[in-house]
Amino acid sequence: MNIRKNSKSVSKRFKVTSNKLILYKPASKSHLQEKKTVSRKKRLCRVKRIKVVDSKSIKLRYMF
């Protein structure tokens, strides 16, 4: 019997809430911050929701 596994890359990058919303943190916050404005750095810190169009493909890879 085959066991279905989560995609490791998807499970590291996305979190599914109890309401089945998929959340992620945007990239570009880890380095080279001197040239970025304060408002841009604040915006990059926020957790964002995945668009409905992309959610189906992520849910297939993220089973639980």
From Swiss-Prot:
UniProt keywords, alphabetically: Chloroplast, Plastid, Ribonucleoprotein, Ribosomal protein
Protein's name according to its UniProt entry: Large ribosomal subunit protein bL35c
Subcellular location: Plastid, Chloroplast
GO biological process, one term: translation
Family annotation (PROSITE patterns): RIBOSOMAL_L35
Gene Ontology, cellular component aspect: chloroplast; ribonucleoprotein complex; ribosome
Main subcellular localisation: plastid
GO MF annotation, one: structural constituent of ribosome
Disulphide connectivity of cysteines: none
InterPro entries per UniProt: Ribosomal_bL35, Ribosomal_bL35-like, Ribosomal_bL35_CS, Ribosomal_bL35_sf
Family statement: Belongs to the bacterial ribosomal protein bL35 family.
Organism: Cyanidium caldarium
A UniProt-annotated Pfam family: Ribosomal_L35p
